[in-house]
Amino acid sequence: MTTDSSPAPVRELLSVAMVTLGCARNEVDSEELAGRLEADGFRLVQDPAEADTVVVNTCGFVEAAKKDSVDTLLQAADLKARSEQGQGRTRAVVAVGCLAERYGKDLAASLPEADAVFGFDDYPDIAARLRSIVAGEAHEAHTPHDRRTLLPITPVERVLSTTPVPGHASGPASVRRRLDDGPTAALKLASGCDRRCSFCAIPAFRGSFLSRRPSDVLQEARWLADHGARELFLVSENSTSYGKDLGDLRLLETLLPELAAVDGVERVRVSYLQPAETRAGLIEAIASTPGVAPYFDLSFQHASAPVLRRMRRFGDPESFLALLAQVRGHAPAAGVRSNVIVGFPGETEQDLETLCDFLVAARLDVTGVFGYSDEDGTEAATYDGKLDDDEIRARVEHVSDLVEELTSQRAAERLGEQVEVLVERVEDGPGGRTVEGRAAHQGPEVDGATYLLDSDARVGDLVRAVVVGSEGADLDARPL
């Protein structure tokens, strides 16, 4: 009997750049993919021009996001084209993420510049898939389908499913690799959504609502803290539903103090609360648990009851204002942000006025304003009463102007208020030292920043300060 003593072939050391578009949930997915790739021997680089392979984690939420994703893929393809002329090193461009999952073969056919389109089911084997593309092998993109059909109907049984869920990987060590060294990190509570808002396609490609086990969330929280995270930003499509498929709808109230107690974590922040599901116990937990930011990301979407009913949502100005009163009864200085959709099919001028009156009364810190656009496969796309694009743009401009004024007013109301600022950027320049961070009422990237005056703080410090000025949503504060 003879044995083959020849050495195993040495795999080529490949570099990869992850380009992430869209929301914080996508950031988590990118870091999971990065962890899988690094574990398989890929070298991670930041600059796509310096990478052998470019993986673009796309967003497929609204039309503008889709365009941005396609443009980014084309830019990466330009790098590959230049390398083929001896002016670079890029050898493969791959699309992943929501746009890739949502359109699959259709995206691959319409965008031949991308070497492959990977769906969520490809994520566990991303390294092998990517190596095969670099080796010149073809990859057949998936046929798009409704991912809600992949999980059991009974919520409690969903945790037993073997269907890959991006951002839910767990085990003895976190399957994740941080792509920046900032003090804030997103942490997934759940994926998918069981609600059926008429304008939203997300459940079709993200699937039914699936909570992560608390032990997995806590394990990843500890890992993030060990890797420099000081604020944990809890993300999902609907955080108020966390635990319902685990048999405990109040699980988030239990989990929050445990997360806040993780060594090294200074602050925990919850995102995306569905107003119709925001219960009194959860409000109290967010408002009063030490280490949890009194921050309420309430997605109202509109205030007119008729419009909300057409959206397959619930509420009206009175119930929303009562909810805000409940929040501020527990935490008067709580941060509250929201998003609204303007120009929804059938929206009348009276509906628009109702929305504007509500925004004035609500005193929100920040409001995102979006113009309605049809999304493939949604109920709203079939509705009558569509407004023309010019009218939608005019309404968006009107509401945006109002929101800009209201945001400035709300920030000015915080003058003299004491805040705790997590420092995220320190820069020395000709004009002096800039120390930028966020107070408890300011979420990452979308809610403005707080600038510390005459401060020697470092990135990651939590500084107590008093607000002395404001501009838009931004604040100036002096350390105490």
Swiss-Prot record:
Keyword Cytoplasm: yes
Free-text function comment from the UniProt entry: Catalyzes the methylthiolation of an aspartic acid residue of ribosomal protein uS12.
Protein name per the record: Ribosomal protein uS12 methylthiotransferase RimO
Amino acids binding [4Fe-4S] cluster 1: C23, C59, C98
InterPro entries: Elp3/MiaA/NifB-like_rSAM, Methylthiotransferase, Methylthiotransferase_CS, Methylthiotransferase_N, Methylthiotransferase_N_sf, NA-bd_OB-fold, Ribosomal_uS12_MeSTrfase_RimO, rSAM
One Gene Ontology term of the molecular function aspect: protein methylthiotransferase activity
Gene this protein is translated from: rimO
Named cofactor requirement(s): [4Fe-4S] cluster
Entry binding sites for [4Fe-4S] cluster 2: C193, C197, C200
Lineage top rank: taxon: Bacteria
UniProt-listed Pfam families: Radical_SAM, TRAM_2, UPF0004
Intracellular or extracellular location(s): Cytoplasm
GO CC terms, sorted: cytosol
Enzyme Commission number(s): 2.8.4.4
Gene3D superfamilies, per database record: Methylthiotransferase, N-terminal domain (3.40.50.12160), Nucleic acid-binding proteins (2.40.50.140), tm_1862 like domain (3.80.30.20)
Domain TRAM: 412-480
Family listed: Belongs to the methylthiotransferase family. RimO subfamily.
Catalysis performed (reactions): L-aspartate(89)-[ribosomal protein uS12]-hydrogen + (sulfur carrier)-SH + AH2 + 2 S-adenosyl-L-methionine = 3-methylsulfanyl-L-aspartate(89)-[ribosomal protein uS12]-hydrogen + (sulfur carrier)-H + 5'-deoxyadenosine + L-methionine + A + S-adenosyl-L-homocysteine + 2 H(+)
SUPFAM superfamilies in the cross-refs: Radical SAM enzymes
Main location: cytoplasm
MTTase N-terminal domain segment(s): 14-135
Enzyme class, first EC level, given as a word: transferase
The record's free-text note on cofactor binding: Binds 2 [4Fe-4S] clusters. One cluster is coordinated with 3 cysteines and an exchangeable S-adenosyl-L-methionine.
Any one Gene Ontology BP term: tRNA modification
All residue ranges annotated as the Radical SAM core domain in the record: 179-410
